Amino acid sequence: MASYEIVKGDLFTAQTSLAHCVSQDLRMGKGIATEFVKRWGRPKELYDQRYERLAVLKRQNEQGEWRYLYYMITKEKAWHKPSLKDFMKSLVHVLKHMIKNDVKHLSVPKLGAGLDGLSWDLIERALKKQFVEKHGINVTVYVL
């Protein structure tokens, strides 16, 4: 049975697939996105995918196992605020990619609830219902 848990700690200690929100311009100059840039840079393969709702990198974790890094494209420019509708469209793309690639665990910050200002309650409900309950995907939310 899949699980949903909230953990106090550093998202980047997770060895699972990770997701975070970005703008289509891929500026990634604030918030948790800056840490993604420090760790994985801005490879060309991200820019090649930026006109979709989702950009994905496949990278090895510290144990040498493959995992996905999901860059959820929720808005056009870094200074814009996403709508809940656009956020949810991107989240569905993450879910579809995970199902297609048999990914069973996703670790995230409080997606969309930080700088983007979306309702965490609505996002949390979607994660629990669609990922955990409906598709058996484990979700771990990291908070500081």
Model-derived regions: residue spans:
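Macrodomain-like recognition of ADP-ribose-binding/processing modules
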Residues: 1-144
